[in-house]
Amino acid sequence: MRLREGGARVDGVCVRVAMYLLDGVASWRELDVECCYRPEDPYAVRLDFGAGEQGAVWLLSRETLAAGLRGPAGDGDVHIAPSEGGDVFIALGGGAGVALLTTPAGALARFLAATDELVPAGTEASRINWDRCIQEFLSI
């Protein structure tokens, strides 16, 4: 798939995934989450939870997301773990608390497979423009 950014075409993967947010004691609210990956940022996956005041964007490690399909993974504000029913739990923490989400593991596995077609796991470092990174770092 191709992403459009500022009118220019950029190689990348962007898919919509249904996720469910724990909204109360035992009720779940469906969210339409856009999962995006760009080879220019090969270690990161972007989860976009929509626009407006209630919207949020999280950048997750692609490696952590993949590991969370197989077993508990994550540290700090992000934790991911598979469930016995074929879903994946994602806990995102921040100053306002923790959001607990669930989504079908198959949807995330297909998304990650598409990212691996663009940048195979383990080859991410070869996609980084290190000169540009150093230049940006030194200009801070």
Task: Locate the predicted segments by residue.
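Protein-protein interaction regions
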Residues: 14, 23-26, 49, 57, ...
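Short, well-structured hydrophobic secondary-structure segments
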Residues: 27-66, 70-71
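Short beta-strand segments
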Residues: 56-58, 88, 97-101
